[in-house]
Amino acid sequence: NLEKEKKDISKSKDESLFKKSKEISSELDKISTQQKNTKTELDNILSGIPNIPHPDVPNGKDENDNLEVLKAGKVPEFDFKPKSHYELGENLGMLDFDLATKTTGSRFVFVKKELALLERALSNFMLDIHIVQNGYQEISPPLIASENTMYGTGQLPKFENDQFEIKFDEGSDRKYLIPTAEVILTNIVKDKIVDQKDLPMRYVASTPCFRKEAGSYGKDTKGMIRQHQFYKVEMVSIVEKENCLEELERMTNCATDLLDKLELPYRKVILCSGDMGFSAEKTYDIEVWLPSENKYREISSCSSCSTFQAQRMKSRYKNKNKETVFVGTLNGSGLAVGRTLIAVLENYQQKDGSIIVPKVLRPYMNNLELISAK
């Protein structure tokens, strides 16, 4: 033991031993540096390992191996060729992509007039249902997250290239615009031992989200499907680990209930192992019907992460046996507001390019029934 040898030498007055003491100190410094480097290397490897899929999850490579578990709603039949949301929006003079390209760049949009009102109505409608009917607590969170917060939910280090890092004060920690409110809402329990009686904790927030969409070059270049900035209503649940899968069913039902109320056709799929997100143990995607594409497109993703994020965030609770154990975390879109706007435009379009306002949204829009060019 080098430390013990060094201590023994310090009690001696022998010159040669003092020299040896210096050598031991140097050796200890080297070992300490090696240990730190090895730990950093190990941490980097471990932080890049994804969650383990739940046994329920089908094996597969990509979206082609996902499993449809539900189809709901009636796909509309038109006696004309349905237009895309961006054609409809531009013809109404209420979606302006060219102006956004001029002021900001590609993959941004100006939403104007009644469509801006419709976007806000959708967000408020979703929040009201989640708060009043589904028992979620509304939060208005910061839109900027620290590096540590992003690590906690699994966005970093693996997905650094997809994040918008912002320059803050010189010398301060790295900061990022949130890619989803999941990041900031889940971290509410970071470094905490929560009281078991407070579980489940259910939070909801409507926020802008910011993503570079790295790796999606050439995909969905037209319209609002894939934007760098978009609104999303996000649900987050903190539960006892044993209740994760039950909570996942509940959360997914909260999302599909909105589509039922909006009378939009959709399907629910369980993602295969190869298509799941980094932090998830099990994920349902909800896909809404888009007439212009003649197919279903993702409008919500609901995931159980079991204790994966909790271990990174050190979020725990004391169970019945007085043991301190990790919480389970879940997150889900309820719903992506921009994509819901797209679905309303396309499914409720009329031959003349006007849009019928869904009944449940009219109280949020001064009882407006039809959006048309004036």
Predicted regions mapped to residue ranges:
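TRNA-recognition modules of translation machinery and tRNA-sensing kinases, especially anticodon-binding
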Residues: 71-374
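N-terminal alpha-helical targeting/anchoring segments
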Residues: 1-76, 90, 94
